[in-house]
Amino acid sequence: MDSIKSNALYLRLPYIKNNYKEIIKEAEMNELSISEFLTDLLQNEADTRFKNGVSTKLRLAKFPHKLYLEDYKLDNYDAGQRKLIKEIMTLDFINNKENIILFGNPGVGKTHLAVGLGIKTCLENKNVLFISVPNLMIEIKEQMTLNQLHRFKKRFEKYDLVILDEMGYISFDKDVSEVLF
């Protein structure tokens, strides 16, 4: 039995490593065929890996709050705006490599919608970064000073969705705005 645990560890199969004894008992109790046993075992491992991947993506996205699309209120919008927001919620804009800009008065829910879109994107196993524009500008300036701007820009290629928040609250430095836009 120890060889199962050590091999699962070596092969990076955390579900099997942590649960193999119970899985074997359950398979014996239910008289599963080898095929059924392996199918269940590998499906559980895949599910665990997917869940762990999503958890990592959510953590690395750096969302300021957990805000979900299911909790987003569409009551304050007219029919045309509701239709557009529902279309955005499909995330088709990501697959189409389109940009969207959410703008409006403070307190209308732009950040809630943006974070909700980001969380939904993570749940689809895609990479997201949430960053405020003031913090991004600070990072850009630092990278310009260190002559690391090319590497910094390259980092953004791994993201399926980059959410820039608080764009309207700052004045733009000329050099930084050329990089940003």
Predicted feature locations:
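Phosphate-binding P-loop
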Residues: 89-97
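Interdomain "pre-motor" coupling segment immediately N-terminal to P-loop NTPase/helicase cores
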Residues: 5-64
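Conserved adenine-nucleotide phosphate-binding loops and their immediately adjacent elements
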Residues: 61-73
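Short glycine-rich substrate-engagement loop in P-loop NTPases that contacts/grips substrate
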Residues: 77-88, 128-157
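Loop/turn-to-beta-strand initiation segments
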Residues: 98, 125-127, 158-161
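Walker A/P-loop
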Residues: 101-128
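Conserved nucleotide-sensing/catalytic segment adjacent to the nucleotide-binding pocket
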Residues: 148-181
